[in-house]
Swiss-Prot record:
Keywords carried by this UniProt record: Glycoprotein, Host-virus interaction, Inhibition of host chemokines by virus, Membrane, Repeat, Signal, Transmembrane, Transmembrane helix, Viral envelope protein, Viral immunoevasion, Virion
Segments crossing the lipid bilayer: 463-483
Family from the record: Belongs to the alphaherpesvirinae glycoprotein G family.
Cellular localization per UniProt: Virion membrane
Organism whose genome encodes this protein: Suid herpesvirus 1 (strain Rice) (SuHV-1)
Protein name per UniProt: Envelope glycoprotein G
Basic and acidic residues bias locations: 346-364
Gene Ontology CC terms: membrane; viral envelope; virion membrane
Function: Chemokine-binding protein that inhibits neutrophils' chemotaxis.
Signal peptide bounds: 1-20
Cited InterPro entries: Herpes_glycop_dom, Ig-like_dom_sf
Pfam families membership: Herpes_glycop_D
Sequence repeats: 271-292, 308-329
Residues covered by region (Disordered): 290-377
Length: 498
């Protein structure tokens, strides 16, 4: 009985690990779909979001190919009171020393004992903050995170739900099959910008490999041209700025990259204090300075001057290179406005006027040290609010999926990923500009099966236990056979002696 109990428990563990949630097929389409639901305004940031709190619950998920995944919060709030509350939903990626914000949305007037949704929250919902990074986009379906994972998206995802004054934190560990033989290439993901990021060991392709696994609807580019950011559930000024924020905690040696403070009156930001952004690429001039090379002996000729102009730089010239940013100077960024006061629960019969939180991306970025103790910051201070045109906002962008005025899915993701993989990749690093050349390498010497470590470990344990049971049964059978053989021998001896 004890062995049976252990085997049953291990079987349930394996089932829990293997069960994965692929996004419903109705979310896979590449054309805009309108309905009557509209966000009521920008997020108020009245409920603090702390991704550093201890987890209340954990879960696992496993993705393969170009699937659209729907990560559900592994949290249960059914024991709460059903009284209406405002709810904030925020998803993060655990980057180790920092928690990378992915999406953020507020719901108003929601039942306190259920997950928020646009159907059940009578006060409406806010614009959605979403991160676009390294060919990957994220979206919310009510409280669940939608993404199309690549090899660099494997890791721990954090969800924070704030119901009134009560905060809940859950984690989902996502594993991704290590196989490149898919239309989307699989070489994308959030951690690809990390220094020294490398591909995991790639498993060989099996004979029954389903290469076209995933979401690949046809895309109507013309239908997306007139779609506004507000229709996607995003702020109206979404496409006008790219502002980088990140939330770090570990110690006061860590830094926060955020909006640069406004320069004091009478002072100007110097070039040494400014950091390059991607908009400076077109205004970069490279000049070689230092002592001019000695002219060659003899009279100068037109051919000689032409040869000097065509002369290539050598390694000795590297110490004499200056990079100068030319063009009109950029005005310093203005300080962001303070977050508005905590809102009251909203109803359909009340009008609310909201100003748009706008960050100026033209100012320089500076490094600011955190205080020794971790502090709460508003989501507007830790989220990436990127630029983009409607044609590049992939199918499941923003707040559109099955819960917003315009339903967008991951349908366009595969197409844009394939197109983007043919272009040079510009990688933004926090606090400055980093150019990276991607070298594609494939490791075919490994025999990894592509299963996650938890799955393999559970299977190995079950197989080992089953083997022990079989060995025990065999030993018992042999023991009984030996006893019977001895009994027969004793009987023969007794008959012979008689």
């Amino acid at each position: 009985m004890k062995w049976a109990t252990w085997i049953l428990a291990l079987g349930l563990l394996v089932v829990r690990t293997v069960v994965a949630r692929e996004a419903p097929r109705e979310l896979c389409y590449g054309h805009p779909v309108h309905d009557d639901r509209r966000p009521v305004g920008p997020a108020t940031d009245a409920q603090p979001v702390n991704p550093l709190a201890p987890a209340n619950a954990t879960g696992t998920d496993y993705s393969r190919g170009c699937e659209m995944r729907l990560l559900d919060p592994p949290l249960d709030v059914s024991s709460r009171s059903s009284d209406p509350v405002n709810v904030t939903v925020a998803w993060f990626f655990d980057g180790g020393h920092c928690k990378v914000p992915l999406v953020h949305r507020e719901y108003y007037g929601c039942p306190g004992d259920a997950m928020p949704s646009v159907e059940t929250c009578t006060g409406g919902y806010s614009y959605t903050r979403t991160r676009i990074d390294t060919l990957m986009e994220y979206a919310l379906v009510n409280a669940s995170l939608v993404l199309q994972p690549g090899l660099y998206d494997a890791g721990l995802y954090i969800v924070v739900l704030v119901f009134g004054d009560d905060a809940y934190l859950g984690t989902v560990s996502l594993s991704v099959e290590a196989n490149l033989d898919y239309p989307c290439g699989m070489k994308h993901g959030l951690t690809i910008t990390r220094p020294g990021a490398t591909l995991p060991p790639i498993a060989p392709t099996a004979g029954d490999h389903q290469r076209w696994r995933g979401c690949f609807p046809s895309t109507d580019e013309g239908a997306w041209e007139n779609v506004t950011a507000a229709e996607k559930g995003l702020s109206d000024d979404y496409a006008d700025y790219y502002d980088v924020h990140i939330f770090r905690s570990e110690s006061d040696d860590e830094v926060v990259h955020g909006d640069a403070p406004e320069a004091p009156e009478g002072e100007e930001v110097t070039e040494e204090e400014a950091e390059l952004t991607s908009s400076d690429l077109d205004n970069i001039e490279i000049e070689v300075v230092g002592s001019p090379a000695a002219p060659a002996e003899g009279p100068a000729t037109e051919e000689g001057r032409g040869a000097e102009e065509d002369e290539e730089l050598t390694s000795s010239d590297l110490d004499n290179i200056e990079i100068e940013v030319v063009g009109s100077p950029r005005p310093p960024a203005s300080s962001p406005p303070p977050p508005p006061p905590r809102p009251h629960p909203r109803g359909r019969d009340h009008d609310h006027d909201h100003g748009h939180h706008r960050a100026d991306d033209r100012g320089p970025q500076r490094h600011h040290r955190l205080p020794p103790e971790p502090t709460f910051v508003s989501p507007s201070d830790i989220f990436v609010t990127p630029t983009g045109s409607p044609a590049l906002l992939l199918g499941f962008l923003g707040s559109a999926l099955a819960s917003r005025p315009l339903h967008l899915t991951a349908g366009e993701t595969a197409q844009h990923v394939r197109e983007a993989q043919q272009k040079s990749r510009h990688i933004r690093s926090l606090g400055g500009l980093q150019l990276s050349v991607e070298t594609e390498t494939t490791n075919t010497t490994t025999t990894q099966t592509g299963l996650s470590g938890d799955i393999r470990t559970s299977i190995y344990i079950c197989v080992a236990l089953a083997g022990l049971v079989v060995v025990g049964i065999v030993i018992m059978c042999l023991h009984m056979a030996i006893i019977r053989a001895r009994a027969r021998n004793d009987g023969y001896r007794h008959v012979a002696s008689a």
